[in-house]
Amino acid sequence: MPKPLEATIEIAAPPERVWAVLTDLKRMPEFSPNTVRMMPLGAVRAGTWTINLNHDTYYYPTTSRIVRFEPDRAFAFRMNENRTIWSYQLEATDSGTRLTERRDVPHGVRKPVRIMIDTLLGGEEQFETHLIAGMNETLSKIKSAAER
């Protein structure tokens, strides 16, 4: 079963600024190395669906639904195809904001996804190492955008 993954970064900008960058979902391709496009279907809030195009060896579409939307504090979406939850926690600090990105898989992944990870993505350990590197890259780019 996939384990929770987490990455954190300190950003020299207030939570409101980080939130504005993070929740402008059309900008997600600027930050995430695997996201080609993320299009919200309506206003960005809890319950909103997104249509996404991703790239990791090959291009593939996904959909997600925003499951947590607490301005300046917490944001999360659940990927419908593999049931993973990607979340972001914002915490005010003396120097700005601590931003934490997490990937949780509370119900495991469906069998076709498991087969894809094992056969096309090098197995769970290699895949998770790749995901953590992508999370760190995403956070670094969000930091750069928020500190401008």
Regions flagged by a language model, labelled:
Residues 39-85, 93-98, 133-148:
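Glycine-rich portal/gate segments that line the openings of hydrophobic small-molecule binding cavities
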Residues 1-42:
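Hydrophobic ligand-binding cavity/cleft-lining segments
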Residues 79-133, 142:
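Beta-strand/loop substructures that line and gate deep hydrophobic ligand-binding cavities in soluble
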Residues 12-15, 19, 125, 129-132, ...:
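Short amphipathic alpha-helical segments with heptad-repeat character
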